[in-house]
Amino acid sequence: MTSNEKEMGKSELLVVTGMSGAGKSLVIQSLEDMGFFCVDNLPPVLLPKFVELMAQGNPSLQKVAIAIDLRGKELFKSLVKEIDIIKSRNDVILDVMFLEAKTEKIISRYKESRRAHPLNEQGQRSLIDAINEEREHLSEIRSIANYVIDTTKLKPKELKQRISKFYLDENFETFTINVTSFGFKHGIQMDADLVFDVRFLPNPYYVEELRPFTGLDEPVYNYVMKWKETQIFFDKLTDLLKFMIPGYKKEGKSQLVIAIGCTGGQHRSVALAKRLAEYLNEIFEYNVYVHHRDAHIESGER
């Protein structure tokens, strides 16, 4: 939502959807704490009627978040159509947030909660089959989402913090860049738009006194950044991003996720993600956030 649209008093509608077990309930709870009027599991066919209520100017409906999932089954099929209808209006700003997680993580969460998956309420099939079917059903709505968040590696507190950064930031409407470091041995960053592999750089893991630390610590950071290869890579990377990022924004993208990966996600990727976020903050007026997904893992890089 832009500053001009805020001045015009347009209402905000956020549709929260995605995989069952990916964290929709937690996101809705967080948004409610931030002053959103929240509705859980509204049938998609009722979305236009709800927007009509919002358009009447009720102050309590100025910022609304609606969670929609496959519990509606057949009704869910109309969601993309209803969203297109709402986007054609000029009095309500609509965003779509899609939450997902790796299949094995969703299985783990369901085992912990002991709840039935919405596509397997009778227990007549395997959980993995239900998850795969749901992922297929959701592919279309995922493709039109403004924000895609992979919660596989996020603790509940970290997910809440990410939502808070989005919606408590006065400049959120401009453009958001998320820079993430990760370790390939722990899995690729699933929600990344751009992935850069820095495993070709000298590895601090093999310097015994540096091994226990991360790229956020000065000795490791200095070690990673001192090499000629690092400087050449960083210069080429920033030249590329200076060219690409304005194009993403021009095409209407509101969030860009840049992931930098090394082997374990503790040293090289952390140092470069830190430096890249600082650089992007210096040259752009966009919101730039940095997250180190695997830096806390004590085993380090291999």
UniProtKB/Swiss-Prot annotation:
Coiled coil start-end: none
InterPro entries: P-loop_NTPase, RapZ-like, RapZ-like_N, RapZ_C
Keywords recorded for this protein, A-Z: ATP-binding, GTP-binding, Nucleotide-binding
The organism's place on the tree of life at top rank: Bacteria
Positions that bind GTP: D69, L70, R71, G72
Pfam families: PapZ_C, RapZ-like_N
GO-annotated molecular function: ATP binding; GTP binding
Residue numbers binding ATP: G18, M19, S20, G21, A22, G23, K24, S25
Task of the protein: Displays ATPase and GTPase activities.
HAMAP family: RapZ_like (MF_00636)
Family according to the record: Belongs to the RapZ-like family.
Name of the featured protein: Nucleotide-binding protein SE_0548
